[in-house]
């Protein structure tokens, strides 16, 4: 077995460009993106550049032109990752790019049409098609989960309470995980499809000027696949692979999307998390960085293993071809170009402590043992006559009685139980036909038959319950070699056919690429051989023009990077200004209602909870109304005997009946202590001044 094998893998980056939509075509926008699938290059022309400026060129592992098929995208992008997770690796596939560039279409597609399905539904058919081809002695357990990150809050899309926020935790043996995230065991691709449909109904979407169904949250669909097979040491080994498929919300500019109100707040959170993702990518590529800011957002923390950790990762950068999206397209391509240099250290997860498959196998063995032992304890006289052993003596009425202590316990099969029931029925019938028995003996024998029958029924019920438990667990395990595709069989055939066509096409492209390289080399060799000074001057001029073009391209690249840096700075400054306004508003409200000395007390006992991203107050469960509900009023005198502090007049929270505290008469007209900041003469003036201050902040 390849257990524990590992290697350094760079993050694979592919680029996909969508076609111009009807709105862009109607407004007369032109495409500024040119893609060469054979060379894997993307060229972007600046619509505002002076004449003669060359287009910017980027090279990636794979590029997909606007006419690319969904099956081709899956086979070249996701198929190697899915094959790896079946072998026990972790894998991540995520779509990155500006809003409205087709990230959700790439990841999900149109699931009602087989040829338009995206990466996530195609992976369902791929996984169960692979299981169907495995050997019979291999066992599989597949479970799925679905979550979203909305406004920096993690929510379970498959949970009952969609308002419940989940905590992100971390353990040395498990890594980063989401506490209380629900996971469902599936047996076929149709189960996965139904679960995904359920989760999509709960996902946050909204309309903007750039996308009518814009994703307002980051969604992560996770498939956990456990397999158990025999190793070289003749022992069962469990390998666990996890596949995270991430549909990111797109970066937005308020001037283009027209977002206001709640949509603007969502866009701010989305941009902040994507900015953190960009910072993580930059820090991983920059060898000088000593700190990677994974914890700055929930998204990067959940993707910690996928970026520079134990995972095989593919990033699909989605871009738009329209000229008015030039800046966003260049920014996306630059981030994607950096991500190519991220190195991951993927290894097979063999025999992890939290594997459910091993627990299920142990439980199955235990249930089988209980079923085999469930009939023990019944006397042999309850079994068929041909299997009786021990001495017998004749009782009154001719009914045989057993001598105790000489009969071994037996394991009962369903056939033996049926024979025992038949024998009891026959003895009941024989008892009814006996006319010469004493009534007392008849009742004794009847009670004995009832006892035996009740014990038999109890054994049958116990076996039924155990069998139901056993069947329920066995249904969760999938045996290799069993075809579970059902309706998805057509999809698997479509994927395999597309994969074969893709291999043939790639082989042709590779041969053509080699031929073009050879011709290019021949041309360069010919140019190097000059027959005269005039030819040499002509050749040098061509080289000079080529170098000059490269110089102009580099200058243009520097200018674009400076402009992009300026735009990012302006966006960050705008976020800072927005947060500052919210902070000043919060501080104004706090200062208006909480005296300064109590603010200092709160600050002294407050701490930051990294897991949920909130400030928490220590011992808050033992304050206020929580204590008022628990403390009886009758204990007032008893509590005063211990000299407790008089907190009855602390900031209008406690009254004569609250917490059994001693009431100290107020000084003056008001019932609250004086504060260092003083108090306005009237409440109306206080409210008016606060309202005017709030209005000034919100303007």
Curated annotation (Swiss-Prot):
Residue ranges with Basic residues bias: 400-411
Pfam families xrefs:
Kinesin (PF00225)
Q: Does the keyword Nucleotide-binding apply?
A: yes
Q: Where is the composition biased (Acidic residues)?
A: 376-395
Compartment list: Cytoplasm, Cytoskeleton
Keywords (alphabetical) are: ATP-binding, Coiled coil, Cytoplasm, Cytoskeleton, Microtubule, Motor protein, Nucleotide-binding
Q: List residues of the Kinesin motor domain.
A: 10-342
What does the UniProt record tell us about how this protein is modified after translation?
The N-terminus is blocked.
Offer one example of a GO biological process linked to this entry: cilium assembly
Please list where the region (Globular) is annotated: 620-699
Chain segments annotated as coiled-coil in the UniProt record: 341-619
Q: Report whether ATP-binding shows up as a keyword of the record.
A: yes
Which residues does the annotated region (Disordered) include? 369-415, 432-456, 660-699
Chief location bin: cytoplasm
- SMART domains xref list: KISc
Q: Where is the signal peptide?
A: none
In this chain, ATP is annotated as bound at 97-104
* Example GO molecular function: ATP binding
What's the family?
A: Belongs to the TRAFAC class myosin-kinesin ATPase superfamily. Kinesin family. Kinesin II subfamily.
Q: What assembly does the database describe for this protein?
A: Heterotrimer of a 115 kDa subunit (KAP115) and two kinesin-like subunits of 95 kDa (KRP95) and 85 kDa (KRP85).
- This one is known as Kinesin-II 85 kDa subunit
Q: Which organism is it from?
A: Strongylocentrotus purpuratus (Purple sea urchin)
Q: What is the lineage of its organism?
A: Eukaryota, Metazoa, Echinodermata, Eleutherozoa, Echinozoa
Q: Gene encoding this chain?
A: KRP85
């Amino acid at each position: 077995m390849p257990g524990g094998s590992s290697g350094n893998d760079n993050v694979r980056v592919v680029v996909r460009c969508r076609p111009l939509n009807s709105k862009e075509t109607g407004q007369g926008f032109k495409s500024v993106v040119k893609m060469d699938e054979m060379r894997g290059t993307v060229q972007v022309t600046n619509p505002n550049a002076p004449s003669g400026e060359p287009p910017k060129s980027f090279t990636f592992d794979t590029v997909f032109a606007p006419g690319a098929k969904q099956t081709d995208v899956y086979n070249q992008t996701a198929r190697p990752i899915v094959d790896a997770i079946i072998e026990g690796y972790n894998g991540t596939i995520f779509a990155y790019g500006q809003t409205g560039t087709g990230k959700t279409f790439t990841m999900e597609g149109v699931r009602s049409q087989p040829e338009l399905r995206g990466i996530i539904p195609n992976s369902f058919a791929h996984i169960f098609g692979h299981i169907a081809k495995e050997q019979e002695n291999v066992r599989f357990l597949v479970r799925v989960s679905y979550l979203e990150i909305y406004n920096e809050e993690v929510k379970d899309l498959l949970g009952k309470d969609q308002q419940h926020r989940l905590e992100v935790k971390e353990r040395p043996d498990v890594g980063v995980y989401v506490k209380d995230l629900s996971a469902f065991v599936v047996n076929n691709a149709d189960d996965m499809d139904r679960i995904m449909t359920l989760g999509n109904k709960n996902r946050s979407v909204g309309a903007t000027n750039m996308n009518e169904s814009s994703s307002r949250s980051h969604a992560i669909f996770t498939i956990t696949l456990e397999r158990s097979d025999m190793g070289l040491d003749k022992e069962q080994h469990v390998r666990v692979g996890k596949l995270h498929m991430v549909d990111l919300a797109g970066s937005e500019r308020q001037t283009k999307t027209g977002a206001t109100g709640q949509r603007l707040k969502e866009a701010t959170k989305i941009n902040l998390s994507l900015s953190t993702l960009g910072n993580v990518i930059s820090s991983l590529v920059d060898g000088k960085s000593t700190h990677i800011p994974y914890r700055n957002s929930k998204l990067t923390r959940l993707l910690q293993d996928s970026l520079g950790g134990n995972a095989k990762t593919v990033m699909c950068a989605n871009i738009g071809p329209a000229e008015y999206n030039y800046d966003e397209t260049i920014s996306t391509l630059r981030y994607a170009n950096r991500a190519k240099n991220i190195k991951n250290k993927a290894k097979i997860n063999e025999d992890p402590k939290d594997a459910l498959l091993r627990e299920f196998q142990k439980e199955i063995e235990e249930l089988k043992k209980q079923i085999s032992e469930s009939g023990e304890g019944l006397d042999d006289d309850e079994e068929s006559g041909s299997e009786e052993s021990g001495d017998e003596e004749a009782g009154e009425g001719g009914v045989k009685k057993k001598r105790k202590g000489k009969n071994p316990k037996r394991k009962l099969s369903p056939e033996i139980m049926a024979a025992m029931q038949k024998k009891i029925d026959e003895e009941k019938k024989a008892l009814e036909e006996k006319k010469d028995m004493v009534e007392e003996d008849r009742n004794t024998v009847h009670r004995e038959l009832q006892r035996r029958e009740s014990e038999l029924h109890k054994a049958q019920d116990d076996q039924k319950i155990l069998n139901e438990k056993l069947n329920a667990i066995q249904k969760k395990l999938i045996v290799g070699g069993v075809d579970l595709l059902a309706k998805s069989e057509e999809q698997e055939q479509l994927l395999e056919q597309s994969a074969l066509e893709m291999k043939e096409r790639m082989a042709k492209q590779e041969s053509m690429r080699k031929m073009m390289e050879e011709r290019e080399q021949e041309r360069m060799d010919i140019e190097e051989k000059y027959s005269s000074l005039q030819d040499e001057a002509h050749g040098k001029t061509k080289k000079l023009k080529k170098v000059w073009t490269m110089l102009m391209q580099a200058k243009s690249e520097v200018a674009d990077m400076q402009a992009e840096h300026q735009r990012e700075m302006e966006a960050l400054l705008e976020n800072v200004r927005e947060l500052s306004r919210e902070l000043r508003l919060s501080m104004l409200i706090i200062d208006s209602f909480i005296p300064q000395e109590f603010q200092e007390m709160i600050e002294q006992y407050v701490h930051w909870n990294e897991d949920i991203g909130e400030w928490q107050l220590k011992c808050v469960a033992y304050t206020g109304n929580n204590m008022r509900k628990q403390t009886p009023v009758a204990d007032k005198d008893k509590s005063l005997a211990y000299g407790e502090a008089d907190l009855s007049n602390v900031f209008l929270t406690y009254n004569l009946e609250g917490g059994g505290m001693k009431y100290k008469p107020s000084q003056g007209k008001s019932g609250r202590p004086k504060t260092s900041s003083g108090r306005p003469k009237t409440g109306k003036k206080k409210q008016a001044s606060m309202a005017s201050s709030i209005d000034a902040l919100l303007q």
